[in-house]
Swiss-Prot record:
This is Protein SEY1 homolog. Residues 1-801, 847-889 are cytoplasmic. Residues 679-699 form a coiled coil. The gene is SEY1. GO terms for cellular component: endoplasmic reticulum membrane. SUPFAM superfamilies: P-loop containing nucleoside triphosphate hydrolases.
Length: 889
């Protein structure tokens, strides 16, 4: 294992592998439990040899046999873990304490002839670097050089003290640096160590301190405020080697038990030591002002960011695994399990991992970076929260649509036409909710059809209110699930609330789309039933055409139907149309976004109602719902956020949809436009009915002709054989004129209010009129010829004209043949058909001239005759079997 490494080379470049070296030697996780010693002194003064004996290091030493030369170039770093030593008895007992490792910095010797005149720059930099890092600076000097300037390191001491003041003058809590003077080749016989120490302190340190140019605030400060001065004498390493080794061992124990700080005095955690060295050296080389507190802050920022990134990297793996699991299988349990998992497995675990190392650095920076860590974790956790909330919103949106569909399924299944009641549902109830509902007695008395109709009308009249309440309940459930996702950060004593707005926007949009879809579907059902009702009121238009005698009568009657329909629809269905279609100029002008989210908040403390001002911005009318669909979604989202605020504040949500509907009911312009819409629908159905009548014009003309031509004033069938030819022609002319009067009626050559705005005079095309007239003329002429034929031949064909004696002679002469045929018929079992034939003859005599009745009788007789043959065959077979059985007996 490489127990030493060069951190700064001869050219003054800092090496980049210090961190890896510390990690390999298990020095990066010591926290503050380590120390740093640097040694300064003249070149070839035995610094590396002293360190090797004192701390069991392996720095390169000079081979004197090869001559004096520079051995240590730049700065080298090694360590001693003191595994063979202990810190001695503890205060509480005889147990020994483990000794913190010490990093040993071997600095290139000063006064080097190899560097020449450039040595001062490197010496100053290395001294500054050593003082910035070391708890203890060893000043290595020879005893016999104490009176010299260069050899005694007087200049080096001055540099050390100036640099130390430069470094720590701004730090009120600056750590004291241990200045350990190792006096080499010292003999007790020369002078005691106390005299040597006094000489060093008085003639060197105090003198230098007095002569130094100090800032005003340090003028009266004693040198002891910055340094702890220790002097140790070491015997000659060659002449008295055993004593030298003994002195070194004593110094080792003194370091372990007395001089060594319990923790690194520079307050740099070991994991940031390499980066701190890099920053310090680069600042020194750039000849910038070396500000130790700023350097510590820079290091704290760097290390806290580095620790934060490592923690985030570890947490990201856990979050990704959870995200993959939650994406593959969504359920309500995943939402319930999220909060404890996120709090313990992600947030608390990450904070604990972060503070293990980061807490050693500047507190303010550590805490600030921990907030950044939390923010980063929350951003990643937001993805899982979004997944959970998106699952929730999909379930809730589907539930909303299903419940609303189920609520209105009865309306979609009922296809009956409306049986309008006289009571109007436009009345506003005193409770402000609008609408009217039948009393219990009325419900018992109404029929099933009317009961179903009333139920549908009540549902349609409160569609927006029901949807609003259902939407609010949906948002309450959404917010309940959202609150399960919020995380409590116990170490911060706060709760983090995730962003729910994207999921709420999706939910609001889905609700709005489903609401409009169901609303449009119900509007279609309402329109279909309304049109069917209108059509049923116009079903007698054809019958009226057959009996009406002038255009004024026909169109006045039609106008009464139109007005009655308009009034009935307005009285019974206006609230339905306001809810499903909207009031105003165009479809959807009363939109879901404009009314549904319009709610208020009751404050439980003062019971006062606070109306949201946003509502006023969403009551405007629109001519095209499709063109503003996106705007409606935006409005829906904004107002649903308002509902969430109501839920957050635990207030009472009071829907004002009923009040908005009532305002529309009282709005004369809105009602007028709805009435215009009703009239448009009524007239569309009327036009369709008139088009249908136009297509069947010939049939109606013929029916009008038959109603006069075939029946007299008493509505009895005419007996053409009793009517003369002149009278027949007169009846034909009157019937024809009456029949073709329908054309003048349909062409509406009269002034009729309301209807004139939709149907112009002569609205039936001439081609259709001519085609119907021609077809009707042919049929009328055919009917007239039939009447003439009956008139001419009816009397001759009558059996009443045959003389009585003819029947007597026929009976006498045909008696035998009559008996023969009678026996024959009974033998063949065809007596029933004969009776049927007789019935035909009889009916002919009775209903002579009534062609329709005769036709019906003939068809009935033919059917009975056709089916009676098989019956008699079966009876004949049964009779034959019975005869055979009797013969056998």
């Amino acid at each position: 294992m490489d127990t030493k490494t060069q951190i700064i080379d001869y050219d003054g470049n800092i090496m980049e592998d210090l961190k890896e070296w510390m990690i390999r030697n298990k020095l990066a996780n010591l926290g503050f439990n380590y120390n740093v010693i640097a040694i300064l002194g003249s070149q070839s003064s035995g610094k590396s040899t002293l360190l090797n004996n004192l701390f069991k290091t392996s720095f390169d030493v000079m081979n004197t046999k090869l001559g004096h030369s520079q051995t240590t170039q730049g700065l080298w770093l090694s360590f001693d873990t003191f595994e063979d030593s202990s810190a001695g008895p503890s205060e509480q007992g005889s147990t020994t304490r483990k000794v913190n490792p010490t990093l040993i910095l071997d600095v290139e010797g000063n006064d080097s002839k190899e560097r020449g005149d450039n040595r001062l720059t490197f010496e100053h930099r290395s001294a500054l670097f050593s003082l910035a890092l070391a708890d203890c600076v060893i000043v290595n000097l020879w005893y016999h050089s104490l009176g010299n300037f260069t050899a005694s390191n007087y200049g080096l001491l001055k540099t050390v003290m100036e640099v130390n003041l430069e470094l720590f003058q701004q730090d009120e809590n600056c750590p004291k640096t241990i200045l350990l003077f190792t006096v080499r080749d010292w003999f007790e016989e020369f002078a005691s160590i106390d005299i040597v120490k006094n000489k060093i302190v008085e003639e060197y340190l105090n003198k230098i301190w007095t002569e130094m140019k100090k800032p005003p605030e340090a003028e009266k400060v004693n040198i002891s405020n910055y340094f702890i001065v220790e002097v140790v004498g070491l015997s000659h390493g060659i002449i008295k080697k055993e004593e030298f080794l003994k002195d070194v061992e004593n110094l080792r124990q003194k370091w372990i038990n007395q001089l060594r700080p319990l923790q690194y005095s520079r307050n740099i955690p070991s994991d940031g030591f390499a980066h701190y060295c890099n920053n310090i050296w680069n600042t020194i080389v750039k000849q910038s002002q070396l500000d130790i507190p700023s350097q510590k802050e820079m290091l704290a920022t760097f290390r806290c960011q580095e620790i934060k990134n490592n923690v985030i990297s570890n947490a990201s793996k856990v979050i990704k695994e959870k995200l993959a699991a939650s994406s593959s299988q969504h359920s309500s349990t995943s939402i319930d399990e999220f909060k404890p998992w996120a709090e313990k497995e992600v947030v608390e675990k990450s904070l604990d991992e972060y503070f293990v190392d980061a807490s050693r650095y500047t507190e303010s920076i550590c805490l600030k970076t921990s907030e950044e860590l939390l923010d980063s974790l929350f951003i990643q956790l937001q993805t899982i929260v979004d997944n959970n909330l998106n699952f929730t919103q999909r379930v809730l949106a589907a539930k909303f649509a299903n419940e609303l569909n189920t609520m209105y399924s009865v309306c979609a299944s009922d296809k009956n036409v409306f049986l309008f009641s006289k009571e109007s549902n436009l009345q506003v109830r005193k409770d402000g909710k609008g609408g009217s509902s039948p009393s219990a007695g009325d419900k018992k008395d109404t029929k099933d059809t009317r009961s179903s109709q009333d139920k549908c009308i009540r549902l349609w009249s409160s569609f927006l209110l029901n949807a609003d309440k259902l939407e609010y309940n949906t948002l309450c459930k959404f917010f309940e699930d959202y609150q399960k996702c919020n995380i409590e950060v116990k170490k911060r004593n706060k709760t983090h609330e995730f962003n729910y707005k994207p999921s709420l926007s999706i939910l609001s949009t889905a609700i709005c789309k489903d609401l409009n879809r169901i609303r449009n579907a119900q509007l279609t059902v309402l329109l279909d039933r309304t049109r069917a009702t209108i059509k049923s009121r116009f079903k007698n238009m054809e019958s009226l055409l057959i009996t009406t005698k002038n255009p004024e009568e026909y169109w006045n009657h039609t106008l009464k139907i139109v007005k009655a329909l308009q009034e009935s629809i307005n009285s019974n269905l206006t609230k339905c149309f306001i809810n499903l279609k909207g009031g105003g100029a165009g479809p959807g002008s009363i939109t879901t976004a404009g009314i549904i989210p319009n709610g208020g908040l009751y404050n439980d403390e003062d019971n006062t109602f606070h109306e949201d001002n946003l509502v006023e911005a969403h009551n405007s009318l629109s001519d095209n719902q499709t063109g503003h669909e996106n705007d409606h979604y935006v409005e829906e989202n904004l107002l649903n956020f308002h509902k969430i605020d109501v839920i957050k504040n635990k207030g009472k949500y009071i829907s004002t949809v009923g009040e908005e509907i009532d305002k529309q009911v009282k709005n004369k312009n809105a009602i007028a436009e709805l009435n215009s819409y009703y009239l448009d629908e009524i007239m569309d159905v009327l036009k369709s009915k008139l088009d249908e009548i136009s297509d069947n014009l010939s049939s109606i003309i013929i029916q009008r002709f038959e109603s006069v031509f075939n029946y007299d004033d008493a509505e009895q069938p005419r007996q053409w054989r009793e009517i003369s030819m002149a009278e027949l022609k007169k009846i034909f002319r009157e019937s024809k004129n009456y029949a073709f009067l329908i054309i003048d009626i349909l062409q509406k050559n009269v002034q009729v209010e309301i209807i004139d705005d939709y149907l112009p005079n002569n609205f039936i095309k001439d081609e259709i009129v001519e085609k119907g007239k021609n077809k009707a003329k042919r049929k009328i002429q055919e009917m007239c010829r039939d009447a003439q034929y009956i008139q001419e031949t009816g009397a001759k064909m009558s059996l009443k004209n045959v003389p009585l004696f003819f029947w007597v002679i026929l009976l006498i002469l045909g008696w035998n043949e009559l008996l023969f045929f009678t026996r024959f018929f009974f033998r063949l079992n065809i007596i029933l058909p004969l009776f049927l034939a007789a019935a035909v003859i009889l009916s002919t005599l009775v209903f002579n001239g009534n062609m329709e009745v005769l036709s019906i009788i003939n068809k009935a007789v033919f059917f009975l005759a056709k089916n009676s043959f098989g019956v008699y065959r079966q009876l004949q077979a049964m009779g034959g079997k019975a005869a055979q059985g009797a013969a056998a007996d």
